[in-house]
A protein has these predicted regions:
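Flexible glycan-contacting loops in extracellular carbohydrate-active proteins
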Residues: 168-196
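A carbohydrate-recognition surface predominantly in extracellular/luminal proteins
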Residues: 67-90, 106-109, 200
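Short tryptophan-centered beta-strand motifs in secreted/extracellular beta-sheet-rich domains
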Residues: 140-150, 156-158
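Enriched but not universal
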Residues: 1-23, 201-205
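Short surface loop/edge beta-strand patches of beta-sandwich-type extracellular domains
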Residues: 9-13, 55-80, 130-136, 188
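Short, aromatic/His-centered strand-loop micro-motif at the edge of beta-sheets
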Residues: 121-144
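Glycan-recognition/cleft segments
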Residues: 95-121
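Short, tryptophan-glycine- and acidic/Ser/Thr-enriched carbohydrate-recognition patches
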Residues: 20-49, 54
Length: 205
């Protein structure tokens, strides 16, 4: 069964406590107050006009080394919310972020594809949480993506520019069942055009 229910538009506030805040205006420093370390895992990311360009093989990741757990980013048994502003450069399918402490792990992940307007979110078990057309030109301007799972047992909801677009039809620990998912990785990690990102925030209950 296609795991989406398209709903009426509505507004949403923040869920839980801010754990990670990466404005990506001039660097990848966490401004949440939790001092979560980040690093350039590969490539040469570019900061310009208040945003981060992740192009070619550029990758930004939490932790000072690969595989370093950030316990406050663990979502096991919790509700969570993530949000960010993004503008696509590539027209093809691109990985925007991965919920992992390892740069080589492919899931959980969020993908965007400018040519079709599709957003895809896959769980740590590679389940299809969302596959939905966001209904706008991803390259025209920055747009806001917000995904909220209020509690572990609730169904995640997808908001675009603060308007509810869709809801998943199942809940659970979609973002992982261990500390292996207690981190984030940003970037395509491949020799291709990418995207611009800013104002990333992550909350847990």
């Amino acid at each position: 069964m296609f795991p989406l229910g398209v709903l009426k538009k509505e507004q949403v506030g923040s869920v839980g406590v801010l754990r990670l805040s990466l404005p990506f205006a001039t660097n990848a420093t966490d401004t949440s107050g939790n001092a979560i370390p980040t690093r350039t895992a590969q490539g040469t990311p570019t900061y310009s006009s208040g945003s981060l360009l992740l192009d070619n093989d550029d990758v930004i990741a939490t932790g000072t080394t690969d595989g370093q757990v950030q316990s406050s980013l663990n979502t096991v048994g919790k509700g969570w919310q993530l949000e960010f502003d993004v503008k696509m450069i590539a027209t093809e399918y691109r990985g925007i972020l991965y919920k992992s402490i390892y740069t080589s792990v492919g899931f959980p992940c969020l993908y965007l594809e400018q040519s079709t307007g599709l957003l895809r979110l896959r769980s740590y078990l590679n389940q299809d949480v969302f596959t939905v057309n966001v209904g706008l030109d991803m390259s025209a301007a920055f747009f806001n993506v917000k995904i909220v799972q209020t509690a572990n047992t609730d169904y995640p909801k997808l908001y675009i520019n603060n308007n509810l677009i869709a809801t998943c039809l199942f809940g659970g620990d979609l973002f992982g069942d261990s500390s292996n998912q207690a981190g984030f990785v940003f970037g395509t990690g491949s020799n291709s055009t990418g995207f611009k990102i800013k104002n990333f925030k992550f909350y847990t209950t």
